[in-house]
């Protein structure tokens, strides 16, 4: 365990601590080597406060290991925003250049997007913290997987096409019907009578502008070509979105957030006489890492058919702006807007 501490101390002193490896491999042994071992030398789960300490300490290395207890007693006066260490930034800058060179060689369509709210992708990934975040393993930088971007863009099309059918009043059931039809690869049967509604939503109008004067069946054909089905791969590649290197040199790329569930005993208990949700339950703070507002990302899509790829990119812009990507989007997280 002492070797682990020495390793992280060395990384901090050299300003090259890999945030991804630290976050996933060493918590919370950096704070208290004894945290993961109980008196019987068995693995023990860290408490909420210990998780909080481990998250906060990302920006401070190990805060002079022998002074941690004193720091804790002073209510953790630790910066809750995390910048990329200088040496790690230099390595990431080189990776970013290689990545953009690759995109250019493929003639991908790229755009700069900035987070309009906090962003967290991979919140439910397996982690000793109970919460997680998706980081580039070798660089400790948050990113948005291309699969996540493709998924939210595809769902945007389901929501819009759900406006085109009039089977029932439940909008989300209609959207699910559209989704099932697309996944099976035969949406035309379900959408054979689909038509643009007279009262089209703002999102619907922007969606239709992307496809011009095309009729609904032609739009469906192009969507199948973009996203594919269970039997056929799509013709457009959705690349991972990564932070723009030159714009994050002195900008925090991670910050601490908190969720505060109150009624765990009511929902988790199998007993019948448990008191209903109310003020008599205690909040249980759960700390987790997010990407702050105003962090720039490079978003890219590619494909052989340039016109089809441009339409896919336009759909991505709508999806990131209106639906958001990652976890907690219903609370406003994960919104990104293109900028110049």
UniProtKB/Swiss-Prot annotation:
Protein name: CRISPR system Cmr subunit Cmr6
Family to which this protein belongs: Belongs to the CRISPR system Cmr6 family.
Compartment(s) where it occurs, according to its Swiss-Prot or TrEMBL record: Cytoplasm
Record InterPro entries: CRISPR-assoc_prot_TM1791, RAMP_III_fam
One GO CC term on file: cytoplasm
Oligomeric and partner information: Part of the type III-B Cmr ribonucleoprotein (RNP) complex, an elongated RNP with Cmr2 and Cmr3 as the base, with Cmr4 and Cmr5 forming a helical core along the mature crRNA (39 or 45 nt in length), while the complex is capped by Cmr6 and Cmr1. The 5' end of the crRNA is bound to Cmr2 and Cmr3, while Cmr6 and a Cmr1 subunit (Cmr1-1 or Cmr1-2) cap the 3' end of the crRNA.
GO molecular function, one term: RNA binding
CDD domains tied to this protein: Cmr6_III-B
Entry-linked PANTHER family: CRISPR SYSTEM CMR SUBUNIT CMR6
Biological role stated in the UniProt entry: CRISPR (clustered regularly interspaced short palindromic repeat), is an adaptive immune system that provides protection against mobile genetic elements (viruses, transposable elements and conjugative plasmids). CRISPR clusters contain sequences complementary to antecedent mobile elements and target invading nucleic acids. CRISPR clusters are transcribed and processed into CRISPR RNA (crRNA), formerly called psiRNA (prokaryotic silencing) in this organism.
Keyword set includes RNA-binding: yes
Location (main, coarse): cytoplasm
Species of the source: Pyrococcus furiosus (strain ATCC 43587 / DSM 3638 / JCM 8422 / Vc1)
Keywords: Antiviral defense, Cytoplasm, RNA-binding
GO BP field: defense response to virus
């Amino acid at each position: 365990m002492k070797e682990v501490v020495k390793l992280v101390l060395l990384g901090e002193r050299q300003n090259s601590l890999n945030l991804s490896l630290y976050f996933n491999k060493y918590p919370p042994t950096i704070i208290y080597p004894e945290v993961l071992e109980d008196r019987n030398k068995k693995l023990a789960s860290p408490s909420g406060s210990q998780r909080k300490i481990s998250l906060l300490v990302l920006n401070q290395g190990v805060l002079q290991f022998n002074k941690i207890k004193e720091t804790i007693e002073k209510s953790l006066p630790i910066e809750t925003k995390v910048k990329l260490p200088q040496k790690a930034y230099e390595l990431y800058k080189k990776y970013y250049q290689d990545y953009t060179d690759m995109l250019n060689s493929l003639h991908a369509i790229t755009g700069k997007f900035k987070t309009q709210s906090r962003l967290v992708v991979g919140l439910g990934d397996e982690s000793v913290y109970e919460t997680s975040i998706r980081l580039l393993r070798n660089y400790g930088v948050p990113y948005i997987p291309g699969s996540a971007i493709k998924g939210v863009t595809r769902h945007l099309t389901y929501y819009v096409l759900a406006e085109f059918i009039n089977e029932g009043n439940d909008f989300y059931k209609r959207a699910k019907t559209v989704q099932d039809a697309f996944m099976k690869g035969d949406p035309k049967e379900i959408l054979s009578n689909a038509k643009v509604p007279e009262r089209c939503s703002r999102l619907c109008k922007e969606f239709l502008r992307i496809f011009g004067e095309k009729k609904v069946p032609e739009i469906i054909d192009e969507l199948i070509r973009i996203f594919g089905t269970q039997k056929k791969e799509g013709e457009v590649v959705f690349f991972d979105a990564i932070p723009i290197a030159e714009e994050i040199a002195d900008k925090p790329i991670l910050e601490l957030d908190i969720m505060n569930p109150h009624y765990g005993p009511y929902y988790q208990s199998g007993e019948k006489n448990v008191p209903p949700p109310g003020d008599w339950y205690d909040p249980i703070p759960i700390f987790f890492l997010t990407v702050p507002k105003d962090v720039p990302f490079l978003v890219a899509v590619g494909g052989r058919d340039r016109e089809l790829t441009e339409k896919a990119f336009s759909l991505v812009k709508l999806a990131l702006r209106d639906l958001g990507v990652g976890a907690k989007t219903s609370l406003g997280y994960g919104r990104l807007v293109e900028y110049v």
